[in-house]
From Swiss-Prot:
Keyword tags: Lyase, Quinate metabolism
Subunit and interaction comment: Homododecamer. Adopts a ring-like structure, composed of an arrangement of two hexameric rings stacked on top of one another.
Residues annotated as catalytic: Y23 (proton acceptor), H100 (proton donor)
A molecular function (GO) term: 3-dehydroquinate dehydratase activity
Enzyme class: lyase
Site residues, Transition state stabilizer: R18
Species this chain originates from: Talaromyces marneffei (strain ATCC 18224 / CBS 334.59 / QM 7333) (Penicillium marneffei)
Reaction(s) catalysed (UniProt annotation): 3-dehydroquinate = 3-dehydroshikimate + H2O
The keyword Nucleotide-binding is assigned to this record: no
Annotated protein name in UniProt: Catabolic 3-dehydroquinase
Length: 175
């Protein structure tokens, strides 16, 4: 059975408590439970790990080598600072999807730069905690055959990807 690893960086253990006006009231445990259940529906094992420490995240990435098929990562503040986590991801050659709960492009200027986006197979930004579910859905779409994949430009210049041949089309928005 394929395995997806969800990695969460610093302060995401406070999800649901920290700045709910930005990040919402859903807890990290809620997110993990939803993703694990969604994985089961698609015959995918979903594991999750959170750390406030860069080295622990790097160690977990290294442990994933040859054991994990895809990583869903919310590097949190490390998005803008960690070449080391980027290098770890590239070093193990596991494809990854970058997720951010808030729209980092609508926040402070320093949050606009990511050390991960250019290497990610997809970036899901600003969909709240649903972004994790969208990442799992996107990853499991590879199980479907004969998908008609399309994209278009949104009103704000964002790129919207969608699979029109699915009974319930899934959107992935990249700003």
């Amino acid at each position: 059975m394929p395995t997806i690893l969800i990695l969460n960086g610093p302060n995401l253990n406070l999800l649901g408590l920290r700045e709910p006006h930005i990040y919402g009231s859903t807890t990290l445990q809620d997110v993990e439970n939803i993703c694990i259940e969604l994985g089961k529906q698609h015959n995918v094992t979903v594991d999750a790990f959170q750390s406030n420490h860069e080295g622990q995240l790097i160690d977990r990435i290294h442990e994933a080598r040859n054991k994990v098929d895809l990583i869903v990562i919310n590097p949190a503040a490390y998005t803008h600072t960690s070449v080391a986590i980027r290098d770890a991801l590239l070093g193990v050659s596991i494809p990854f999807i970058e997720v951010h709960i808030s729209n980092v492009h609508a926040r402070e200027q320093w949050r606009h730069h990511s050390y991960f986006s250019d290497k990610a197979v997809a970036c899901i930004v600003g969909l709240g905690t649903f972004g994790y579910e969208a990442a799992i859905q996107h990853a499991t779409l590879k199980q479907f055959k004969d998908l008609t994949f399309r994209y278009k430009r949104g009103d704000y210049g964002e790129v919207i990807y969608y699979y029109e041949s699915l009974p319930n089309p899934i959107l992935v928005v990249v700003l």
